[in-house]
Amino acid sequence: MSTLNIAVAGSSGRMGRALLEAVERAPDMRLSAALERSGSPYLGKDAGELIGSPCGIGITDNVDTALDGSQVLVDFTRPDGTLVHVDRCREKNIKMVIGTTGFSPRQKEALWIASRDIAIVLAPNMSVGVNVTLKLLETAARVLNEDYDIEIIEAHHRHKVDAPSGTALLMGEVVAKALGKELSEVAVYSREGHTGEREAGSIGFATVRGGDIVGDHTVMFAGTGERIEISHKASSRATFAEGALRAARFLADKRNGMFDMQDVLGLRQ
């Protein structure tokens, strides 16, 4: 069994630590680098100490040297930082698994351009369960059509900085596409005051932030006399970390291109 050398960006964060633990558990992977932002109090420390198991890999903010010897960089950071990492990976021909959310259209375009040269899995949610849920939503939207009003409710921990979540937006995109629409044309992101009646065919979003909620998503199809709710609730970041490593394995034999978890899981039709 060949070993895949994995670099982790944002290694001291909540997802970073979950990734370190997942790499340590994986028999076919080895931690090759642990990255942190400049000024982080964790710089210079053994990355393994973050999860109670020293590994001999020091945490660094030097992207160039850290990526030497790595095959895949797993990045759950923030858009600006991810774009810096993309440029370095492109220079060094290193594949990327990107779980960062909150990209602007221009930033997404930069990722697509980079994928001409390197292989990238870009997914706002790496959970296997969420990606199965997306297939269920696609089927439900196609069958129920516009006879049902669609609302998407998501909840996350108090530290999340973007809203709606990338997963909620992806769910909206899947549903809108199944209805033959663009999400940008039908999305309603806030309601306040005298809003008037609900506009037919719109897709509403509601956001909750609080506590340590890992991630809850519910898509409601509300019809006359009945309501269908399709939900996914994450109780541990380990599910996202395991999905990210599955994505890294998928990229092992890919030279370039943009992929998502539907590709990784073989759900693409």
Curated annotation (Swiss-Prot):
It comes from the Bacteria. Its EC number is 1.17.1.8. The active site is at 156 (proton donor/acceptor), 160 (proton donor). NAD(+) binds at residues 10-15, 36, 99-101, 123-126. The keyword tRNA processing does not apply. SUPFAM superfamilies: Glyceraldehyde-3-phosphate dehydrogenase-like, C-terminal domain, NAD(P)-binding Rossmann-fold domains. (S)-2,3,4,5-tetrahydrodipicolinate binds at residues 157, 166-167. Belongs to the DapB family. Catalyzes the conversion of 4-hydroxy-tetrahydrodipicolinate (HTPA) to tetrahydrodipicolinate. This is 4-hydroxy-tetrahydrodipicolinate reductase. It comes from Nitrosospira multiformis (strain ATCC 25196 / NCIMB 11849 / C 71).
